[in-house]
Amino acid sequence: MNRYDLIIIGAGPAGLSAAISAAKNGLSVIVFDENSKPGGQLFKQIHKFFGSKEHKAKIRGFRIGEELLKEAEELNVTVVLDAIVTGLYQDKEITVKIGEEICHYKGDAVIAATGATENMVPFEGWTLPGVIGAGASQTMMNLHRIKPGNRVLMLGTGNVGLVVSFQLLQAGCQVAALVDAAPKIGGYGVHAAKVARCGVPFFLSHTIIKAEGGDRVRGVVIGEVDSSFQLIPGTEKHFDVDTICLAVGLSPMSQLLHMAGCKMQDTPLGYVPVIDENGATSIPGIYAAGDVSGIEEASSAMIEGRIAGAKAAEYLGFLSEDAAEETTAELELALDRLRKGMFAPENRGKKITLTDEGIPVSESLLTKGYLAEDELDRFPGIAKGKGIHPVMECTQNIPCNPCQDACPRKCIKIGETITSLPVIDEENTCSGCGMCVASCSGQAIFLLNEEYEPGYASITLPYEFLPLPVKGDTGTALDRSGKEVCQAEIIEVKTLKAFDHTSLLTMKVPLDMAVKARFYKSGGCSHE
């Protein structure tokens, strides 16, 4: 039987982070993963992460995965792929199917970082080819470079549904609509806004009635639901689509912990093990980290993994109690920073009407996916100024502050609490470098110059689509809802290594469109 100080099940963000944390303290570590590639969800996450520097903010998920893998390899962590753990027992022994062979491994401690699986929603036609999970579509696009379909309807407006919808657009798919039975958008408003300004409509208080097609998806019918989520007759709407993506939540894959005899509980986060603040289960030496203990963001999973790795090192005597306490206290503080604001775990299901600063939230953002013009003036980041200046359409208390760190002239302030709304420091002058625009994980910052030339303004916006426009191109400016508003001319295209594949387009629009225009589309304006 093969023996290791620590066995980790799952090579995703939590598992790799736990392995690194433990190996740094001298433990022999082996990690098993059922997939052919390590990294879990990270390698299909091409978007930039939120948080602060300590949470790897403004770094794309797949790059974080590469960093974790490299660090694990340098620490001589053994990673076994295509390895299905079929059993976990109280004595910390596991059985693993590798190829056609069943292998036995014994650890002095075990960390389960098995993640979660996508939920499905049954409806008429839900087993037709073309009905897929949002995560599956991410795998197809970002790992295998395959378009899931040509015209897609997305069910679910949490962060997964919003992020994947944007990535579908980047892949060249048409997104017919985002649909959700809830009356409000569930994910970050900045994610919704970048989808809305591409012209994608939201249908809230709606659900899928049926998928149409004999051999595959050829259409979908949705309908409105009442406050009890019952279908309202006569509200049916039809869309011609060939793909239906489901982003309706995740369920923790906690079966192995249950099998081991860990105490379990049903919670709003799923069927999860009972753990303490350090991830320790009811069985000494067995820990849980990441989505297996409750669904959160990958940033949280990485910190939970590091905590579990440190506590396993303490449990086995590789780390003193004082050193472990110091390490975990710092990590718990970082985790706590991520769990603040409107989307904090304790706020799930609550109706939030005011920001932490006491500002009324944008109802338009929650119900339509974009800010209404009559709501703009209430938010501190959307300030008028002379010459070129940033306009920050970040209006919810979400954990993120890269813009503050990116600005070389300190024009942007967020403060110690990373969920605070960004504000403009009027004592400092914007240079127009665009670092804040490129660093914003939510693509919610623009540079505005209403004095560009008589009768015209310039707007610099983030752009992550191909083909990339070139200077001199003329096209159409779209407003926050994706509506065509005027003709636009590209006057500058900036692409730097520091921007990490977020190009900056600067377009010239009529002065009266400076407050409206927020996106660029190649081709003429149908209203001209």
Locate the predicted segments by residue.
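Short, surface-exposed secondary-structure boundary micro-motifs
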Residues: A313, R480-G482
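Residues forming the flavin
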Residues: M1-L376, A457, G523-C525
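Short, well-ordered loop/turn sites that connect or cap secondary structure elements
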Residues: L468-V470
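Iron-sulfur cluster-binding cysteine motifs and their immediate structural context
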Residues: N401-T419, M435-E451
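Short beta-strand-centered aromatic/proline hotspots
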Residues: K483-K497
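Short, solvent-exposed secondary-structure boundary/capping segments
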Residues: T495-V509
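Short, structured beta-strand/loop micro-motifs enriched in basic residues and often containing a Trp
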Residues: Y452-P462
